[in-house]
Amino acid sequence: MGSRLEEFKRGSDYLICIDSDGCAMDTMDIKHYRCFGPCMVAEWGLEKWQDALLARWNDINLYTGTRGINRYKALGIILQEIDRDYCPIPGLRALENWIAATGELSNKSLEDAIAAAKAAGSSAEGGGNPEGAAGNPAESDGTEAMKKALSWSVHVNEGITALSEDEKKAFPGVKEALASLKGRADLVVVSSANLQAVMDEWKKEGILEYMNLVLTQNDGSKAFCIQELLKKGYDENRVLMVGDAPGDYDAAAKNNVCFFPILVRKEEQSWRKLREEAADRFFSGSYRGEYEEAQIESFRDNLR
C-alpha cells in the first residue's frame, strides 16, 4: 500500500475513494458526544445550559446539512447562538474574523493569529496600557475567545487520544464491502482526519489491507486529492466517492465524479447496498443519472 499521492500509480481503470470518520469508521459520534461538545461546555462554563447546547452541537456536527463541518466553523456557529440566546462570549468578533479569513483552520493557524493580535496590541499601546495593565491581557487585545477556542481544541484532541481502542470500530459491513471491491478498483482512503489515527484505526479493524493508498489532511482537501487522483488517468465516470457528509458530496461534485452516500444512522444498510447493488451499477456504467440522483436525494433527506 502506498502512502504518498505523487508516487501512486493507477492499477485499475476504476477508482473508489472512501472517507474514514463517520463513513467507514464508527468514530464520529463518540468524538462529538464524548469530546467536542463536553469540552466546549467546560471551556466556557456553560453547564447551566448543558443539555440544550450538547444537543445543538450534535445537530450541527452529526445530524443536519452541516455534518462533517470543520471544528472551528462549528464552534463559530454555536458560539454565535450562545452569545445571542444564552450569555455573552467575550472576544467572539475576533474569533469570527479569524474563522472567516484564515486559509487554514488549524491549531497552528490560530496560535499564529493570537500572537499577531498580541503583537499588534502591544504596538498600538506604545509600551503602556493604563486601562488594561491590571486587567486580563486576553481581554485587552480581544483574543479571549480565540485563546479559549485553542484551549478547547487542544483538550478535544487529548480527549480523542484517550478514547479506548475498543471504542473505535468499523461499521458493520465495511470489511465485506471492501473485500468485494478489492481487485475490481483501486481503493483509496480520502479523509480529512489525522494520518496516523486513520492508519492505526484501519489496521486494527483489519481493513487497511484492502486499500491501495491513504490520503488524509496533510495531503490536502478531499476535492484536491480527488483532483490529483484524476490526473493518474481515470475517467470521471469511473471514479466513485463514498462518504457520509455534505463535504464528501461537494468534493465529488467539484470533480464531476460519482458519489455514493453512507447514511447516518443507516450505515450498515448503506454498506450492504454498496456491496450488493450500487457497485455493480458503477462497474457496469449504469450508476450515473437516475440511480445516482436517487441516492443523493436520500442523502439530503436524511440530513434534514
Predicted regions: what is each one?
Residues 17-19, 242:
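Generic enzyme active-site microenvironment
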Residues 23-126, 132-199:
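Alpha-helical substrate-recognition element adjacent to the catalytic core
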Residues 13-15:
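Extreme N-terminal starter segment of soluble prokaryotic enzymes
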Residues 128, 166-186, 194-304:
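C-terminal cap/substrate-recognition subdomain and adjoining C-terminal extension
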Residues 2-5:
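Short, basic/aromatic recognition patches
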